[in-house]
Amino acid sequence: MRKIVFVTCLLISSIGFGQIKWITMNKALEEQKKEPKKILVHFFAQWCGLCKRMENQTYQNQEIIKYVNDNFYAVKFDAEGGEKVEFNGRTFTNPTYDPNREIKYGGNGSRNQFADVLGVRSYPTMVFFDEKANLITSFPGYRKPKELEPYLAVIATDEYQKIRTQEDWEKYIKNFNHQVKE
């Protein structure tokens, strides 16, 4: 009887503690060919405090985890790291990347070419691609779960195609039905 109670408690305690299924950009592009889905790339730097906060708070929110996993291939990309990306017939690297480098606030001036070509200049930055790996848009800056939710939804539902002005965006936000309770 104690075993049953223990196992039941263990199962109940593990429900809802999922994680975002982070994969590499190359893996996301490969998966997208088999099962089309939008891609969310979370660009970060190891020294970035707001990136860590977003990873430890925003991306730990259960509603955000579920929404991201259901609607996107999620890529966590170290913009100053050495990951090699094959994208649109080109290879992107960080030619001056040194895995033994000292990590210091403000970076070391060595950015991955993939981040550069997408115009990523600050961290964190989220970049979104459609189901055919075409760039949709990017959103720089830290977002709390409730702040991030409408950005995810506007991309996932293709509502972004209807938003042309700041007024359109403000109307979208005003009418947005939040699931995140914070």
Report each predicted region and the residues it spans.
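A short beta-strand-turn-helix
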Residues: 21-39, 68
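Typically the conserved alpha-helix immediately C-terminal to a functionally engaged Cys/Sec
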Residues: 52-69
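Non-globular targeting/processing and membrane-anchoring segments
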Residues: 119, 130, 136-182
